[in-house]
Amino acid sequence: SNSILPGVTVQIVCDGKSVKAIAADLNGHFEIEVGGYEMCNLEFSFVGFLTESFSISEIRSPLKVRLKDKTQALGLAVVSGSISERAVEEEVVPIEVLKPYLADNTNAVGLKGLVAKTSGVAIMDSQVSIRGGSGYSYGVGSRVSLLLDGLPLLSGDLGEIWWSYLPMEHIAQVEVIKCAASSLYGTGASNGVIHFRSVWPSSKKETIVKAFNGVYSDPQNESWRWWDDSFSPVLNGASVSHRQAWDKVDLVVGGNVMSDKTYLSTGHEQRARLSAKLRFRPANGLLYGVSAIAQYQQMGRFILWDDFETSAYLPMDGTSSEDKWFNMNIDPWLTFSDKSGGSHKLKTRFYRTARFNPSGSISMASNLYMGEYKYGREFNEHISAQVGTFLSIQSSFSSLYPGVSLLTFNPAVFGQIEGHHGRLRTVLGARFENNLNPGFYDESSGPVLRAGLNYEIRKGTNFRASIGQSYRFASIAEKYFSTNLTDGIDVIGNIDLQSESGLNLEAGIKHKVMFGDKVVYLDAAVFMLEYEDMIEYTLRPQLDSTGGIIIDDGVLQFFFQALNIGKSRIAGFEWSANGEMKVAGIPVRVFGGATFQYAGDLSRDTSQINMGAYIDNFLDSFGDTRDSLVTAGSLLKYRNSGNFKLDIEADFGPLTVGGSIIRQDYIDDIDWYFNELVSGLANFREQFTEGFASLDARLVYNAADNAKFSFIVSNLKNEVMSSRPGILSAPRSMVFRFDYKF
């Protein structure tokens, strides 16, 4: 692409051995003395690119070298799991990589729809869980951290992921870490990380315009349809992304608008977003820039259906709302490579979320200020290390909090050392973080450690194993948020919540299968997660002094509250496939896998603390005994036993034909009071004990003049599905999309 490539290893190789090595600076410049080595080669290598080699006797100074992108030709490169960019098969932790084609060809208008295709990932409404690590927490608190270009992007007070905020028009790739990453990314990463990496321009100026229009079908049950024959729920939107590079300046700018007049009567959403990135590349190893996003969004919240049999697309009285939000972030950053080979990286972020009430005034706001400094250095070909410090300051305002506003501080220090000797790569890391809310609490994570190894069994086959501690501080909302949800249901904060901690163990094998210049990664893994003082939202009755349920105006009174439920253990296994191959000369891309997990509640069923009893239940859960496990209280609530996901597409000349299937198992256990409160829920759960399956299909025509036309059908068979109790997933939808590249 003619882009500058900093950090390339330049070495003199004689008889297969490296005798001298340096690294190119941030501008791609290098100087190396080759006198006396005329019979040797000058070799250029960098993770994600093919190695180039030149005979020293034949080269002339100055030398300009172009490296071919191995990320597309021979593999995937990731940055989320280590100090620097590395081939995905060399990582010590499990990472899945989602490429832009998957977002474009499936019309993923938000990050949620893209990440949901990842094996082992379950998204309940908007709450994400990796390998059963999370239940459902009603939009507050997340065990999975979202990163945007290396920094966390969880809202300051709610601690939630704003899926619609990510600039999909600028997607470079998304990396999903499927294990605890607290030692790297702190609180919020106890169940994994989703890292959205945005694109930078190549040497060629490029503008991409996208537009789509779609419609929802009528549901299977005609009584759910709240619209008349003159109207059908529709969705449409458009985006633009412009990317341009000058001599020492890079620019990315874009915008997005979207409207979803959805099948849920109060779930409509409209949004408009602007985004920009600017990077300067002066001389002397310096690189700096700034990026920014601003989004206005109107969205309806649909919490519980009115009645499954007759009005599942209408909300229960009092459980819906119409919200208006404004989100923005500004990210100044700087990197510098010193003469000793050290790398200095400073990243900062200001992130604001604000909700407006119907009168237009602000009813809730959170300002998040954060900064991170990292120093990294490769001491030799065997050892590299990084150390750093992190600070976030959160200022949150809401009439639902005590004292109306709250201020919290999260300082942290961290470090990591990586070793590489022959086929073996090792990683050791640690982090210490504090959570301070003046006048309320001061808590510490203690030292959080991780260790891992990766061993190349043979060329193209790598074994990995890792162990990592995790922790999560309770969010402000979990501690303080209190409100009335509907008649008979309140949400009550819990100031006594303790931080949760955990341990994650994982081992796996990744095998790279080559198809000429194409590659498919096959991965198999086993895993176990343990949590202490696990925080889960629980539905409970409000009791009077005699222990009876309080009745107000003939309505039983209940409340949701976040509780430390105690000890839990989740174990399972997973396989996945990701990449591109050729079958009979036809390019085929595949992404998917299957996960099975057993989520044991060791506090309700204390016998499972014994590993032997836990393994017995794990094995029994394969059969028809899961009902007895529910009765015994052996299972964590709001989890399923696993899922199967597969997305596949093939190119036939200018035509691309693709489809996907998602198979989600039944949620075995929920708060049983739900069956009494939500009309028709018990009947719904009796009907769908086998879980749900969804089939999607798409057809893409790639025209010769940089135009692309797509027809995408989601939920092709118009099946009834649900991601969590009390809400139905979308019926069939059909979308036409047009893309054009200037």
Regions found by a protein language model. Name each.
Residues K210, F527-E530, L556-Y673:
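Gram-negative outer-membrane beta-barrel transporters
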Residues V8-V13, E43-F49, R60-D104:
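Short, acidic, small-residue-rich periplasmic hinge/interaction motif at the N-terminus
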Residues K345-R355, R464, Q498-F559, L563, ...:
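Membrane-embedded beta-barrel scaffold of Gram-negative outer-membrane proteins
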